[in-house]
């Protein structure tokens, strides 16, 4: 059985009505290369200011994203299991938290968090397998490998966008 995949549609945030879609595509085409200036983010600002390498997939995608950890908590997950309020987590704790995210993937259906996570998985990390308990460790390892590379440091990523 093949693993369900994730994809990114160029039209994913555009209206569906045909005349509006054509106009939106033109606006997007003419502006997509411009920089985004936004004070909003879900990682500690010191990571960007100090250009610190991301330590692990869990702290990057789960622990510091209050939307993600609140949705998981609303579905019965203890915040401490996601690293919230903890100063340190072991490698196994980080993997366990990432497995929890993958086990609860269905709970993100129809949410902005799902959109953001898919955009990050596919668009930044090149991961097209839909997260599940069966592939959680493989996805974790792929992200961990990528964030260890200089091209995935915070400022390098910002420059790439």
Predicted regions mapped to residue ranges:
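Metal-cofactor-binding active-site regions of metalloenzymes
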Residues: 2-35, 41-161
């Amino acid at each position: 059985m093949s693993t369900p995949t994730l994809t990114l549609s160029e039209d994913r945030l555009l209206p569906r009505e045909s005349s509006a879609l054509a106009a939106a595509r033109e606006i997007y085409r003419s502006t997509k290369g411009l920089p985004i200036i936004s004070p909003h983010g879900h990682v500690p600002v010191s990571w960007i200011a100090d250009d610190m390498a991301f330590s692990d997939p869990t702290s990057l995608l789960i622990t510091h994203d209050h939307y993600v950890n609140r949705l998981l908590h609303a579905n019965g997950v203890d915040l401490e299991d996601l690293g919230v309020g903890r100063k340190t987590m072991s490698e196994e704790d980080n993997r366990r938290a990432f497995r929890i995210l993958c086990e609860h993937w269905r709970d993100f259906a129809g949410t902005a968090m799902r959109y953001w996570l898919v955009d990050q998985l596919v668009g930044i990390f090149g991961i097209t397998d839909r997260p599940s308990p069966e592939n959680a460790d493989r996805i974790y390892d792929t992200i961990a490998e990528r964030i260890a590379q200089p091209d995935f440091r915070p400022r390098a990523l910002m420059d790439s966008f």
